Amino acid sequence: VYDTNGDRCKEIADKYNTKAFRSVTEAINSADAVSVVVPTGFHFDTAMKCISAGKDLFLEKPITKTVDEAEKLIKEADKKNIILQIGHVERFNSVILTLEPYITNPRFIEVDRLGPYSLRNLDIGVVRDLMIHDIDILLHLVKSEVKQIHAVGFCVFSKTEDIANARIVFENGCVANVNASRVSVKKLRKIRIFQHDSYISI
């Protein structure tokens, strides 16, 4: 375990009977693979250190703060034959895994991922914090290239968007309407899928 807070690092290491490292370089060099769970602004530099050290890594989402950084990271990982897995864990949620066999020919999908305001992850907007999970699920379920995207977002309490809506049109004709908010009164997770022969709501 490595953390910039030495006391917290030792506390976690003691709790799980593992070693507390004094530097990120020492931790990376001692590992077979690395799980990078740091604020988004540090993803690129930390992941690059892992790749340079030849370590496979699991990187919390979003991959980086910018598309340019993401492309550089992917290119470097490919060049060094490093496994770079991004933490889009919702795709492996048991509900999504159960749903998957029933998705045959989706025509319209409505997705809501709403949550109350929190001081967590304010360095990125709601699209890369919450909606990114639903975009990943949609791409996985629809299995078609994206043709068109119309999106809008608004800042309410943060410097980045707190509310966002995206309408995604796929090449196969499926349309998805995706809503994300981190300024809602209560938490809501809902997916509604309309197909020619069925309606699924979870």
Per-range role (PLM):
Residues 87-94, 115-146:
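Mid-domain beta-loop-alpha active-site segment that forms a flexible
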Residues 18, 53-55, 80-83, 174:
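A short helix->loop->beta-strand "cap" motif at the edges of active sites that frequently abuts
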Residues 16-74:
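Beta-loop-alpha module in the N-terminal Rossmann-like domain of NAD(P)-dependent dehydrogenases
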Residues 136-202:
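Contiguous beta-strand/loop segments that form the cofactor/metal-binding neighborhood of enzyme cores
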Residues 22, 38, 59, 86-88, ...:
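Short loop/edge segments at beta-strand edges and connector loops
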Residues 1-13:
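NAD(P)-binding Rossmann-fold cofactor-contacting core
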Residues 23-25, 113, 154:
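Conserved SAM/SAH-binding loop
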Residues 64-121:
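A contiguous active-site-proximal alpha/beta segment in oxidoreductase catalytic domains
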